[in-house]
Amino acid sequence: MYTNKQIWSVSYPILLSLLAQNVINVTDTAFLGRVSEIALGASAMGGLFYICIFTIAFGFSTGSQIVIARRNGEARYGDVGPVMIQGVLFLLVMALLLFGFTKAFGGNIMRLLVSSESIYDATMEFLDWRIFGFFFSFVNVMFRALYIGITRTKVLTINAVVMALTNVVLDYALIFGHFGLPEMGIKGAAIASVIAEAASLDRKSTR
């Protein structure tokens, strides 16, 4: 029988990992609100589009997580690796396809949602860089599924902290041009988010 403390020690890192992706959007909003209303609106639209695509990968990883947890519970540890590898490869292919889809049709979709020409242009500038994050965030959710499935969820806490801190520092640096980096505005926010996702993936893959 598990105690409440044991259950909480496993579950709270999962909660933090769920919040991590949203923290990126909140951080972008906080910094871009100091740039202009156009940048703020564009990051909101671009961030929402990104999250909608991201949930496709998240849904697949949840299914993989169930399989991994079952293999782990059955003590079939050797079967966990193949599930993980297949999941990563599948999500990388999915990331490539959705990257291409967004490049080809993202502008048309935004035209239907955004009436302001200036916000549309800023949104597309944001997305042109932000969608490179697909390749990192899609693999990220597969590692999340692995660590939850084998109940090593404390790794997710470190991952969430690394992602949040990296994004805050790089947002400040790239949006406003600090630490010797160029002032890039909304494009800087997108690049910072992608690098933050890459940094968190590096932490997961090296644990």
Q: Which residue stretches match the model-derived regions?
A:
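Signature of the first transmembrane helix
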Residues: 5-65
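Short alpha-helical transmembrane segments in multi-pass integral membrane proteins
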Residues: 1-11, 68-133, 181-207
